[in-house]
Amino acid sequence: VHWTAEEKQLITQVWGKIDVAQIGGETLACLLVVYPWTQRFFPDFGNLSNAAAICGNAKVKAHGKKVLTSFGDAVKNLDNIKDTFAKLSELHCDKLHVDPVNFRLLGNVMITRLAAHFGKDFTPACHAAFQKLTGAVAHALARRYH
């Protein structure tokens, strides 16, 4: 992936303002609510019976923070995302058997949460940069499947 200086600046600028625990929890909760089939990957998370239960679930919030922390690793390693996610790709492919389409869904949900939090500050240029980032992360996570 080739990044322009503007894209790198937009991504790092916004990322520096993110509350990883809050946005991460919201992102994973939204994924589980909007795409309920993704719940099957989290059998140990307890009550995922409705949106309120999912959004209030401590395990969802904790794992969401973990997921967004991984996106932070991508932000720190924009020029080496594939290697940054090599082990996670292996885990999600070989052990967890996650369909790679879910990585793109997660990225799209994260972008909606960022847009909701940052409002007008989440400009079209910023949105485009994050779309490129989430696409690169999804591609890196799916790498082991190819």
From Swiss-Prot:
Residues 2-146 form the Globin domain. PROSITE patterns: GLOBIN. CDD domains: Hb-beta-like. Heterotetramer of two alpha chains and two beta chains. InterPro entries: Globin, Globin-like_sf, Globin/Proto, Hemoglobin_b, Hemoglobin_oxygen_transport. It comes from the Eukaryota. Belongs to the globin family. Keywords: Heme, Iron, Metal-binding, Oxygen transport, Transport. Heme b binds at residues 63, 92. One of its GO terms (biological process) is hydrogen peroxide catabolic process. PANTHER family: HEMOGLOBIN FAMILY MEMBER, HEMOGLOBIN SUBUNIT EPSILON. Involved in oxygen transport from the lung to the various peripheral tissues. GO terms for molecular function: haptoglobin binding; heme binding; metal ion binding; organic acid binding; oxygen binding; oxygen carrier activity; peroxidase activity. Red blood cells. It comes from Iguana iguana. This is Hemoglobin subunit beta-1. GO terms for cellular component: blood microparticle; haptoglobin-hemoglobin complex; hemoglobin complex. Pfam families: Globin.
